[in-house]
């Protein structure tokens, strides 16, 4: 019986640690950039877009595709940073679990 109680306490402790890690990630700002920093985005760790900055010299009405590509690159850069940090901070909680 004591073993089960010990396991429950350990599970609760891990749950609290995981919650703290999730909050740390959510409160972190991630900055994604395109080539030459012409487009910059900021996301919170919960993947909410906070800002989008586009340098005026990249805005060309004759070539919207370049701007679209730069925005996509900046967004993907930030999202991959979030994914990497999430895996680093939360991956330790799921190692060895059967799912």
UniProtKB/Swiss-Prot annotation:
GO terms for MF: DNA binding
Pfam families attached to this UniProt entry: YbaB_DNA_bd
Keywords: Cytoplasm, DNA-binding
Matches recorded under InterPro entries: YbaB-like_sf, YbaB/EbfC
Localization: Cytoplasm, Nucleoid
Gene Ontology CC annotations of this record: bacterial nucleoid; cytosol
Source organism, top-level taxon: Bacteria
Assembly and oligomerization: Homodimer.
Known role: Binds to DNA and alters its conformation. May be involved in regulation of gene expression, nucleoid organization and DNA protection.
Similarity remark: Belongs to the YbaB/EbfC family.
Protein name as it appears in the record: Nucleoid-associated protein LL0120
The organism of origin for this protein: Lactococcus lactis subsp. lactis (strain IL1403) (Streptococcus lactis)
